[in-house]
Amino acid sequence: MKKLVTGLLALSLFLAACGQDSDQQKDSNKEKDDKAKTEQQDKKTNDSSKDKKDNKDDSKDVNKDNKDNSANDNQQQSNSNATNNDQNQTNNNQSNSGQTTNNQKSSYVAPYYGQNAAPVARQIYPFNGNKSQALQQLPNFQTALNAANNEANKFGNGHKVYNDYSIEEHNGNYKYVFSFKDPNVNGKYSIVTVDYTGQAMVTDPNYQQ
């Protein structure tokens, strides 16, 4: 009887020990599973963070490329505008140049003498040279005449009347020579020269014929 009781007790202890080992094994396996899940979750979190960082870096690169492209577009547009402005300026200059040339041609006045002109300038400075060559070097006749008249009016009577002109040549350089009659004094003239630069100068304000 004692042996039976002792056997049952030993069996109970063995089963209890086996159950405890099984529980410990389960706990150990559970801890391993939990640890593996935690590591997997941490890895996913790290991978997700890395993906977000990579996406952010990619986004920065895309934004940088967009900015670079925008800067290039702006530079190209600026260069295009500058080219168009230069072309427009060139066209305007050519147009103005053509207009000036046309105005000069249309305002050209051939040399002439005054009404009932006496041979005064022609007598003082007779010219026998190449008139066409001289006129090519000299300024516009009407412009030179106006400048000479203004200069003559600075001396004595301020309303002198144009009489005649001639051309003087010296070492290949030419000058207009104008005579202006003083309407208040019979036979009195002012002699004025205008050189190839357009500079007017009175050489004799009281020439008497």
Curated annotation (Swiss-Prot):
Residues 1-17 form the signal peptide. It comes from the Bacteria. It is found in: Cell membrane. It is a lipid-anchor. Residues 17-106 are annotated as: Disordered. Residues 23-70 have a biased composition (Basic and acidic residues). A lipid is attached at C18 (N-palmitoyl cysteine). Keywords: Cell membrane, Lipoprotein, Membrane, Palmitate, Signal. The keyword Ribosomal protein does not apply. This is Uncharacterized lipoprotein SAR2457. Residues 71-106 have a biased composition (Low complexity). One of its GO terms (cellular component) is plasma membrane. Its main location: membrane.
